[in-house]
């Protein structure tokens, strides 16, 4: 994600999150945060952005801060592939765990995360400012644990069965290189803000 993506991001954000959504300035601030890692999903034909996600790296924890898909692309596994992208980059920058908060009413998102081995650690009461809704706190086991990797790879195999590409978050297991240190980023750097075609 870059500053140039924000016009398209701001078309999706209020539709995805309603009145309690990030502002354009919030995204701009996040792109200047060296601990922030943000990515977009775009159409391979015309480059149109239809989803995005990202996380903060805090020590060994990748804290997912956003994941959104344009309504026209829902129920097409776009959110699932964005989550796989986050797991891939969390691994690359040295995270051992992943966590997030999700509204207790957002059962669709909860099902996605639970499908990928996230577990509920409890609730944050009155977490959301717009309506004082509680947030469910979700957390993974160590993402380098063989059982977690096996679960993720099973989900990738299921996507491949329906002819969808999905990135393997753990290429080092197959002899590929991986970066284990956090990468320095600038908001305008295309190299540090890749666009994922899903």
Describe the role of every protein-language-model region.
Residues 1, 98-100, 136-138:
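Methionine-biased hydrophobic packing positions in alpha-helices, especially
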Residues 2, 70, 74, 103-105, ...:
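Residue-level recognition of the GNAT/N-acetyltransferase active site
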Residues 3-4, 10-72, 83-93, 141-145, ...:
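Acetyl-CoA-dependent GNAT
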Residues 21, 76, 130-132:
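Non-catalytic, surface-exposed connector residues within folded enzymatic/regulatory domains
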Residues 69, 75-88, 107, 111-115:
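Conserved acetyl-CoA-binding loop-helix of GNAT-fold acetyltransferases
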Residues 90-101, 124:
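Conserved GNAT acetyl-CoA-binding A-motif
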Residues 101, 114, 119-136, 148-149, ...:
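Conserved catalytic-core motifs of GNAT/GCN5-like acyltransferases
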């Amino acid at each position: 994600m870059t500053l140039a993506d924000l016009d398209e991001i701001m078309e999706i954000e209020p539709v995805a999150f309603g009145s309690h959504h990030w502002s354009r300035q919030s995204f701009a601030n996040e792109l200047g945060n060296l601990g922030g890692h943000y990515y977009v999903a775009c159409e391979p034909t015309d480059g149109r952005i239809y989803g995005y996600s990202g996380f903060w790296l805090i020590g060994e924890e990748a804290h997912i801060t956003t994941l959104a898909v344009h309504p026209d692309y829902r129920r097409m596994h776009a959110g699932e592939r964005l989550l796989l992208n986050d797991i891939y980059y969390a691994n690359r920058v040295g995270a051992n765990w992943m966590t997030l908060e999700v509204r207790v009413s957002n059962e669709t998102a909860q099902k996605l995360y639970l499908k990928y081995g996230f577990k509920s650690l409890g609730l944050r009461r009155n977490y959301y400012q717009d309506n004082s809704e509680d947030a469910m706190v979700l957390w993974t086991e160590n993402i380098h644990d063989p059982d977690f990797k096996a679960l993720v790879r099973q989900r990738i195999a299921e996507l491949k069965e329906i002819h969808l590409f999905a990135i393997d978050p753990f290429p080092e297991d197959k002899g590929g290189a991986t970066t284990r240190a956090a990468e320095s980023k600038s908001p305008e750097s295309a190299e540090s803000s890749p666009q994922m075609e899903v």
